[in-house]
């Protein structure tokens, strides 16, 4: 028994990810593509198995589609457990909002909806991850402090060491028992470090 699912893809990357995902699944199916059109043939040994296989593959196709194609709100959806680079959720949300993008966190799905396309999204993740790696052996005391340093470094393009030094000099951080910890309200520190002494850097205006 079989069913056919017809769909469209937006690019070769979407088709490739769909093929890779389906190939890893323990479900009897084949996929054909021509241009941007895709057909998936789903098989089952009885009605119940065919129905379950069909439903599972439809769900996978929809998840892949939402990463590459906007929904009716003009947003993409990225499950956080499928990120190309392992980056802290709060850091991602802060960075996107500071850049002026729309961001919605779906707690029940552990996913982010945003108007950033997947190529730009992965580019942002890659840079945040690279900066985070620079702090692996630092004496920064907590994840929020590390996130703040990475965010400010990413937005202002200052080296992470310069951000830490500036935060210490301005009293936003302090040294305590060999570790660098937060000394003032984190939102106040974020605003001041992002805007600089003149406070004239325009941040967070939604795109």
Curated annotation (Swiss-Prot):
InterPro entries found in the cross-reference section: DUF2067
Which superkingdom does the taxonomy of this entry point to? Archaea
Q: Pfam families this protein is in?
A: DUF2067
Q: What name does this protein carry? A: Uncharacterized protein MJ0388
């Amino acid at each position: 028994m079989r069913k056919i699912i017809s769909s469209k893809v937006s690019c070769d990357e979407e088709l490739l990810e769909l093929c890779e995902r389906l190939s890893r699944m323990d479900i009897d199916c084949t996929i054909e593509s021509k241009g941007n059109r895709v057909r998936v043939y789903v098989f089952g040994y009885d009605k119940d198995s065919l129905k379950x296989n069909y439903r599972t593959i439809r769900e996978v196709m929809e998840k892949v589609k939402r990463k590459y194609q906007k929904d009716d709100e003009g947003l993409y959806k990225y499950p956080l457990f499928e990120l190309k680079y392992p980056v802290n959720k709060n850091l991602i949300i802060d960075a996107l909002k500071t850049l002026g993008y729309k961001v919605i966190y779906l707690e029940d799905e552990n996913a982010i909806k945003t108007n950033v396309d997947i190529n730009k999204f992965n580019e942002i993740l890659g840079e945040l991850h690279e900066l985070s790696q620079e702090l692996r052996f630092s004496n920064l005391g907590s994840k929020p402090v590390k996130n703040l340093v990475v965010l400010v470094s990413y937005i202002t393009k200052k080296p992470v060491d310069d951000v830490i030094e500036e935060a210490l000099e301005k009293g936003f951080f302090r040294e305590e028992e060999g570790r660098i910890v937060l000394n003032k309200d984190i939102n106040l520190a974020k605003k001041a470090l992002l805007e600089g002494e003149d406070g004239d850097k325009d941040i967070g205006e939604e795109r």
